[in-house]
A protein has these predicted regions:
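Short catalytic/ligand-binding loop motif for oxyanion handling, primarily in non-cytosolic enzymes
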Residues: 14-15, 65, 118, 168-171, ...
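Short, surface-exposed charged micro-motifs
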Residues: 239, 306-308
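Extreme N-terminal starter segment of soluble prokaryotic enzymes
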Residues: 1-5
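A generic structural motif
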Residues: 28-42, 186, 190-191
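A short, Lys/Arg-enriched amphipathic alpha-helix followed by its capping loop at the start of a domain
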Residues: 15-31
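C-terminal active-site "lid" helix and adjoining low-complexity regulatory extension at the edge
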Residues: 262-302, 309-350
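Phosphate-binding site of ATP-dependent enzymes
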Residues: 155-263
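Conserved N-proximal alpha/beta basic substrate-recognition cap immediately N-terminal to
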Residues: 12-14, 34-150
Length: 350
């Protein structure tokens, strides 16, 4: 019997804990399931596994992240390249340790540790997707504040300035003529990051050129806002949970029309799949195909792909998250579905 090793942190209540709770209800005759936490790797106490084949499912390492990357008292700007470099080193060490501990075993990673951090680099992700024919927002590469002012004041462009190596809707600045907003803070000429993962509230910084000059010196990506499909008095996006070549669930997310993002962690609201009936079936079919292609292009097997639909019903990929938060079980039991998918896929695999 093959073994599935699930590794995460107990502080990850949104994904890992929900997955473990589902496993407690699951009685498998197909695979042996074992859970472990990242601190066991640090202590050299990973479980002994007799199976010749091990399937490893990696969740987000919250404890490491909070201790070594976005740590308490950190004074730098959120989402900089230092975050990314440390994260990649962490995963290299995890890969090396797992290969050493389970030497001689055949290991299948759901998401390979050497590939799992790539979604943190928004620039690289969108370059890969664009080269593979997937629609992404129009990028801009200037770091001259005069160019930005020209784009928004003379050409009436609407722009997003996002930290290059961030997630969860943190570190976003939106700019259009007469309306600049950011969920950073700007104090005494310095950009200040929130100390929380949630509720990075937006403030008005319209025409604050000093802020603009400063943010342009940071690790950011600049992209044109999607001219989104108009729907009532709300903004929306869709998160598609992709597992290998299947979309397990489509999660519509909405926010009030003057909001900057529909991200749940920053004030957005989840909708049921009934929401999808507002769109022609071919649009949802396109989103499904594009999400599957996106995950394949990024060489991972499980991710949340965030898409937007423009006024002409074209689908654009906005973000990719290799560690997507799981929806509440009452909405859709993602853990249960993944468990069944893994069992179907790996029961007889050698």
């Amino acid at each position: 019997m093959n073994t599935v090793l699930v590794i995460g942190d107990d502080s990850d209540w949104e994904s890992y804990k929900r997955f473990c709770e589902q496993l407690q209800k699951h009685h498998s005759k197909k695979l042996k399931w074992i859970t472990a936490t990242y601190d066991l790797i640090e202590k050299n106490e990973l479980p002994i596994i007799d199976s010749d084949t091990i399937i490893i499912f990696l969740f987000f390492p919250f404890s490491y992240w909070d201790k070594h990357i976005e740590k308490e008292g950190y004074k730098g700007v959120y989402g900089n390249v230092e975050f990314y470099n440390k994260f990649r080193v962490f995963w290299s060490e995890i890969h090396r340790t797992l290969k050493k501990v389970y030497h001689g075993k055949k290991i299948h990673f759901i998401n390979h540790p050497l590939k799992i951090a790539i979604d943190r680099d928004k620039e690289l992700t969108k370059t890969i997707l664009s080269e593979n024919g997937i629609n992404i927002p129009i990028p801009y590469y200037t770091r001259d504040y005069n160019d930005i002012l020209k784009l928004i004041d003379r050409e009436n462009k609407k722009l997003f300035l996002k930290v290059r190596y961030g997630s969860m809707g943190k570190g976003i600045t939106y700019m259009e003529k007469g309306n600049w907003k950011t969920n950073f803070r700007f104090d005494d000429g310095k950009i200040v990051s929130s100390t929380s993962d949630y509720k990075w509230t937006f403030i008005d910084i319209t025409d604050n050129v000093d802020f603009l000059k400063e943010i342009l010196t940071k690790d950011i990506v600049i992209e044109e806002a999607i001219d989104a499909y108009k729907l009532d008095d709300i903004i929306f996006d869709l998160r598609l949970y992709v597992f290998y070549d299947k979309v397990l669930y489509i999660f519509p997310r909405t926010n009030k029309k003057d909001a900057i993002t529909a991200n749940i962690s920053q004030g957005g609201h989840g909708r049921t799949t009934q929401f999808l009936k507002r769109f022609p079936k071919n649009v949802i079919d396109d989103a499904t195909k594009i999400a599957i292609q996106t995950v394949d292009n990024m060489d991972i097997n499980f991710a949340g792909v965030d898409v937007m639909i423009d006024k002409d019903l074209n689908v654009y990929v906005i973000e990719l998250n290799a560690f997507p938060g799981f929806t509440k079980v009452s909405r859709f039991n993602i853990s249960k579905r993944i468990i069944h998918e893994i069992e179907d896929m790996f029961t007889h695999k050698k």
